[in-house]
Regions:
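Membrane-interface interhelical linkers
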Residues: 1-20, 52-76, 114-123, 140-146, ...
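Transmembrane alpha-helices of multi-pass small-molecule transport proteins
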Residues: 13-14, 35-83, 110-111, 157-164, ...
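Hydrophobic alpha-helical transmembrane segments of multi-pass membrane transport proteins
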Residues: 18-26, 30, 58, 75-90, ...
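Hydrophobic/aromatic residues within transmembrane alpha-helices
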Residues: 34, 43, 47, 91, ...
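Specific alpha-helical transmembrane segments that line the substrate/conduction pathway
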Residues: 42-53, 81, 88-119, 154, ...
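Hydrophobic transmembrane alpha-helices of multi-pass small-molecule transport proteins
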Residues: 106, 120-139, 156, 183, ...
Length: 291
């Protein structure tokens, strides 16, 4: 028996978020492998510039006919995107990928608590928070404090990204807003990347890996998330982001040989349960009769 149409509609945007998470975290693992060649900021520049070029070619966004409010929204979205990437890549250059994402996801979780209007959503956020703390294995005090600070700051920018991604999706057709925001984020990162990596950015093999990172970590996931945010409330989307540490841990294990401990495995179970609970709550809220 096929699932009801309402269930399919509620699962659709959730599947987009999960697919985007898989793409971005495996792309991040590839980026870590690229950092010895181009540096953290150089990788960010390659990722954003190449992703912006791809999106401009594919989407051909319209530059005229937008209001000042439209431009303010898309520029803020681009600044949040660029800042989030620069801060996060500085973090993973200093601390393990799983720990960096664990700290970063606290930003979306805080947004979930603030944006939630239902008490049960606070429960899912608390459960996910317990999971991401457990995923750290109680070893955050042994992390490079600068790297941990970068990851936490990236989490704040991630929360801003969620808010302005949703607003951009409502103001711009298709992926036009994403393409424009990516272009602004690329311009923001360009002087930092050139200062750190210089001519190393233009080595053909580095450009090839940079394109892979751009497609996996920017073009595909941001497009999927932008589509999902048109149909998901910000609070539900933010709790779904708690899947990111679990995905990052898997990517770190498969590509970077970072093994999981039993406590980290339990943490993954907690964040998955929290995410599933958030999905069920969102679907139940849509089915509830008004009045």
């Amino acid at each position: 028996m096929s699932p009801p149409a309402g269930a399919r509609r509620s699962l659709g945007p959730v599947a987009l978020v999960v697919a985007g998470g898989l793409s971005v975290q495996f792309g991040a693992a590839v980026a870590v492998l690229l950092m010895p060649r181009a540096g953290a900021l150089g990788v960010v520049t390659l990722r954003l510039v190449l992703a912006a070029l791809v999106l401009f070619v594919v989407c051909r966004p319209r530059l005229r006919g937008h209001s000042r409010a439209d431009w303010a929204t898309v520029i803020t979205f681009g600044a949040a995107m660029g800042g989030m990437n620069m801060l996060f890549y500085q973090a993973v250059d200093r601390i393990p990928l799983g720990a960096a994402v664990t700290l970063e996801v606290l930003g979306p979780l805080a947004l979930s608590v603030i944006a939630s209007r239902r008490l049960v959503n606070l429960l899912w956020a608390a459960l996910a928070l317990a999971g991401v703390v457990l995923l750290g294995g109680g070893g955050f005090d042994r992390l490079d404090p600068v790297g941990a600070a970068f990851a936490l700051a990236a989490g704040g920018m991630w929360a801003a990204y969620i808010i302005f991604s949703a607003r951009t999706g409502r103001r711009f057709p298709q992926a036009d807003g994403l393409a424009l925001a990516m272009g602004f984020g690329a311009l923001l990162s360009l002087p930092f990347g050139l200062a750190e990596a210089g001519s190393r950015l233009f080595v053909p093999s580095t450009l090839g890996l940079g394109l892979a990172v751009a497609l996996m970590s920017s073009v595909l996931p941001y497009t999927l998330e932008l589509l999902a945010l048109r149909r998901l409330p910000a609070a539900t989307f933010a709790v779904l982001m708690s899947l990111e540490p679990a995905i990052a841990a898997a990517a770190g294990f498969l590509l970077l040989s970072q093994a999981l401990s039993p406590s980290e495995g339990l943490a993954i179970v907690l964040v998955v349960v929290a995410s599933m609970g958030a999905v069920r709550t969102q679907a139940a809220g849509k089915r509830a009769p008004a009045g």
